[in-house]
Amino acid sequence: MARNFLTIALPKGKLLTDSLEVLTKIGIECQEVSEESRKLVFPLEKAQAQIIICRPTDIPTFVEYGAADIGFVGKDTLLEENKDVVELLDLGFGYCRFVVAMPEEKVPPRLPDGKFDLSGLNHQRVATKFPRVAEDFFREQGMQVLPIKLHGNIELAPRVGLAEMIVDIVSTGTTLRQNKLVEIAPILEATTRLIANRVAYRMKHERINELTERLRQLLGRAP
């Protein structure tokens, strides 16, 4: 393939629509790309590129190993997967928050500053899709926890005795409230990021930088 040919990895699911929208707005025609299609690879001849559709959690791996030159991925996934990639730009969409939550009847007391006292949660079990993020957060608090990795229905874990608390991503908090869980600590905020393979970023620097700058101007991001 030509040196400036780009393979772009996009996530299946809710981030795909926003990702395609911003690419279209910077002149990359991708009308044929659809999650409804059985295809996973979409050639874009005019743009000298192709789009591949991946599971969100796999995108950092595709980019790290060079199967994709660049990718769109949530910061939550980027932190958890901890792959060796170049983070180029905060794209701003797909906002969510990492939080610690517990059943409302088991929340710890509050400290004078209004925050919940987490000290009594040392060595407790934490159900989460993000064990690395959970461990890192509690380690920063000087605590150890036992992460239990689940792939869905995280809110169920405290109700059936699998874990004392959860670490999960939330957008509005509605699911927590419906399951009688209370947010006891914020961890961090996450949005979608543009990432690049390290070798591709050197070899295709001009092309990748051009695309990054067009996205930056579109989204009004500071350099």
From Swiss-Prot:
It is found in: Cytoplasm. It catalyses: 1-(5-phospho-beta-D-ribosyl)-ATP + diphosphate = 5-phospho-alpha-D-ribose 1-diphosphate + ATP. Belongs to the ATP phosphoribosyltransferase family. Short subfamily. Pfam families: HisG. Its EC number is 2.4.2.17. Pathway: Amino-acid biosynthesis; L-histidine biosynthesis; L-histidine from 5-phospho-alpha-D-ribose 1-diphosphate: step 1/9. Catalyzes the condensation of ATP and 5-phosphoribose 1-diphosphate to form N'-(5'-phosphoribosyl)-ATP (PR-ATP). Has a crucial role in the pathway because the rate of histidine biosynthesis seems to be controlled primarily by regulation of HisG enzymatic activity. It comes from the Bacteria. Lacks the C-terminal regulatory region which is replaced by HisZ. CDD domains: PBP2_HisGs. The keyword Lipoprotein does not apply. This is ATP phosphoribosyltransferase. One of its GO terms (biological process) is L-histidine biosynthetic process. One of its GO terms (cellular component) is cytoplasm. It comes from Desulfitobacterium hafniense (strain DSM 10664 / DCB-2). Gene3D superfamilies: Periplasmic binding protein-like II. Its main location: cytoplasm. Heteromultimer composed of HisG and HisZ subunits.
